[in-house]
C-alpha cells in the first residue's frame, strides 16, 4: 500500500498534467497547442440555444472579433480561463469583441446554469453538441479555443490551456488590424 506522501505526489502530478494538456474524454490526444492560421478559412456557422432558450448563430457576431471557447464545468483548465474571458468581455466589448462559450457538458443546462451564476459569467454561452464539435475539427480536448476575425475567419486555435497574455495579445492584434468601417 503506497504511503500518503506518494499518493499526494501522484495526485499533484496528475493535476499538473491535466492543467498543462487540458481535459479530454478521448484517448490521450490531449495536448497544449497553439496554431496561428496563416491562410484563414471561414469559421463554420452553427445555430445553438443559449441558457434562455434563444437561438444564437455564430454569424450573429460577424463584424466582431470572437473568442469561441469549447469548455465544460468539470474541466480544470477551463475553470482557470473563464475569469480571463469575463475580463476580456468587459474590457474589449465596446471595441467590437465578444466571447462565446460552447459548453460540452454531458449534464446540460442542469450543470451549466448554476456554474454560470456562481462565476458571474457575462458572455453568451450555448450548449454544444457532436455535430458542432466535428465542424471545428472534432474537438477532442477541453478547453479548445478559436479566435475569429471580424470577417468570420479562424485566425488562431488553442488546444489546452493557453496563457492569458497569449489570448490578450491575439485579441488586441485582431482588434487593431483591418478594422471594418462601421464595425462595433
Please annotate each region the language model reported.
Residues 61-64, 94, 121-122:
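Active-site acidic short loop of glycosyltransferases
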Residues 79-119, 128-135:
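Structural microenvironment flanking redox-active thiols in thiol-disulfide oxidoreductases
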